[in-house]
Amino acid sequence: MVDAHTRKTLAAIPLLRVNAGPRSGDLWRARHKEELMSLITYVKNNKENDNDWFRLESNPEGTRWFGKCWIVVDMLKYEFDLEFDIPVAYPSTAPEIAIPELDGKTAKMYRGGKICLTDHFKPLWARNVPHFGIAHAMALGLGPWLAVEIPDLVSKGIVKHKETSS
């Protein structure tokens, strides 16, 4: 199910050890620290491989995340705001990543712009609890979703480049 490139990417993202969610007090703070270290490693690896495609930051508690993601299609950069909350049942439940400005533009999305990861990503996440974290959700969830959906939406004229649509 996972190709060689994806395996290589995954192998470079540190696995997490702390099994804690937002209501776990000190354990959550330890998990949040692990999440940040994993994300830093993933972003660093992406930059080294000329594959930089997102920025994320969180509130101080690490329960609300927001940032930007982008993809280049036909030599044009398409940039989107993204957001998600850490579910109470995290890490047993994967975060639901949302791109609000794309809400209603594709069938592979739920209300509020939450991207559909049910078929491919969620079973993989469930098999890897508590070792997968936010970096894994970006690498295995949002990244592939953007790579498939955005070029399709651009080709159909549903998503237009901001500079050329003015």
Swiss-Prot record:
Instruction: Give UniProt keywords alphabetically.
Output: Ubl conjugation pathway
> What is the top-level taxon of the source organism?
Eukaryota
Q: Which Pfam families match?
A: UFC1
Q: What does this protein do?
A: E2-like enzyme which forms an intermediate with UFM1 via a thioester linkage.
TM ranges are: none
Record-annotated active site? C116 (glycyl thioester intermediate)
Q: Family membership, please give it.
A: Belongs to the ubiquitin-conjugating enzyme family. UFC1 subfamily.
Q: What is this protein called?
A: Ubiquitin-fold modifier-conjugating enzyme 1
InterPro entries (alphabetical): UBQ-conjugating_enzyme/RWD, Ufc1
Question: Which terms under GO biological process does the entry name?
Answer: protein ufmylation; response to endoplasmic reticulum stress; reticulophagy
- Example of a GO MF term: UFM1 transferase activity
